[in-house]
Amino acid sequence: MAEDPHILGLALGGGAFRGTAHLGVLKALEEEGLRPGFLCGTSAGAMAAAFYAFGMAPEEIRNVARNLRWLKATNFTFSKLGLLSNNEIGKFIEKYLGEVQIEDSSIPLAIVAADISTGEKVVFKTGSLATAIMASTCIPGVFMPTQVDGRMLVDGAIVENVPIKVLQEMGAKVCVGVDLGSGGYRQPESLVEVLLNAFSIAIDRTIHHQGEKADVIIKPSLAGYSLTDS
């Protein structure tokens, strides 16, 4: 795999603020001389995949992630479609990567979201990176859906949390998935944490069949992590 990176694909699953665990996986692969030829991600995994695909090293991404204030009170909205605006994510992406297009990444990249009106999987391989990440990380109920071309898009975890099938469609011959759904849960202390726990529990109950498509599934130890830890 090290000699021909174009056969290796890496799918990074969602997990709210557990997403920083993906960086340890990326670093471990680098230490083994492995660099993916294809990247795709859902939710927090989409963010990690995007920064890596645009050339950031894992430790650099970790330092950048510390500056994200995703659940800021100033993002509160009175919309009937969600408690918070997800605009902060779009601004965050553009601050560190600029107003880039997905197709300009140094590693072929795909971002997974879902159409909340139809239940369809929506895969971004071109277009605004910031918009795609906003859609993919838009946890239903917590954030307002992201409007893209007349569609209401939300967190891709509801359709494919570890998007192995997308990797296969991109051309990867060896597909590795990273599942962040094994970390347990903490007692919630706010409405947002109740919603995050409920969403994650529902996704975790459906993830096992997605992993069957992978050649390898990595499940980092996440005991003690909260969905709102950074």
Regions inferred by a protein language model and the residue ranges of each:
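Patatin-like phospholipase
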Residues: 1-42, 50-230
